A protein has these predicted regions:
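Acidic/glycine-enriched connector segments
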Residues: 1-2, 7-146
């Protein structure tokens, strides 16, 4: 079972406790073992930290970093605490300016669970949450703005 994260890049640190609870709930309640997170902004950093913290209790859990750009362009090693990188198939011909959104769309369409923090109406995070709501086989957990 794969869980992905979508959230605003300017998310406040006060969200961390909600993220940690959501990650643990997904491990305990849903049996999620694989988490994939982006690498742009505060929400992604907090989501990664929540999974890294959970891995101390649940060593079977893995964390991958989503690569929107082909690793051949710029080699990316998994940062400390991560287990691997993930570059979605079929992204090779996507123009760079669309790569982040396309990689996120791929994950929305191919994950089992989504943890989302998307309250800003005109944001890409919100658009991706709306896309997720139209997917038939995804369970969405929305974090509350504090």
């Amino acid at each position: 079972m794969v869980c992905f994260f979508i959230g605003h890049r300017n998310a406040d640190l006060s969200l961390m406790s909600q993220l940690e609870s959501a990650v643990k709930n997904h491990i305990y309640g849903y049996g999620v073992t694989d988490f994939i997170v982006g690498q742009y902004g505060a929400f992604d950093r907090m989501a990664a930290r929540a999974v890294i913290n959970a891995k101390k209790i649940f060593p079977e859990v893995s964390l991958s970093i989503l690569l929107p750009y082909h690793p051949y362009e710029r080699e990316v090693c998994a940062p400390e605490g991560y287990d691997s990188t993930f570059y979605p198939p079929g992204m090779e011909n996507v123009p760079r300016r669309f790569a982040i959104v396309r990689a996120n769309q791929y994950m929305i369409k191919h994950c089992d669970y989504l943890i989302a923090y998307a309250w800003q109406p005109a944001s890409n995070s919100r658009k991706l949450l709306e896309l997720a709501r139209r997917q038939p086989n995804i369970t969405i957990t929305e974090l509350v703005r504090t």
